[in-house]
């Protein structure tokens, strides 16, 4: 999730987000951030998920059973369609779905056997310089 958050910092668009896709062994396959690629079609979103999925399609990897780490929940039909077609197995997202549209997308993903979980940090590092 750290990489997805750092990728979102590279974003130059109004709604920054980053996406990091790994295989089942957690090896990086592709990454992307919003605004990285210019869309060839104005009807296609240019979010980090879309950019990473576009890169995944251009590789020889089929995307099956991959895991997506994203700084924002996928909220567009274009990304949803790509996620379903590539048979992604799990999505870790930083922000929880809050809108009605996002909740419907969450239901569709879970109905398609795609696990969706909000990422919660499990470890914190604190350094005390006063000793």
UniProtKB/Swiss-Prot annotation:
Molecular function, one GO term: catalytic activity
SUPFAM superfamilies: Cytidine deaminase-like (SSF53927)
InterPro entries named in the record: CMP_dCMP_dom, Cytidine_deaminase-like
Residues annotated as domain CMP/dCMP-type deaminase: 1-116
Record-given protein name: Uncharacterized protein F10E9.7
Organism: Caenorhabditis elegans
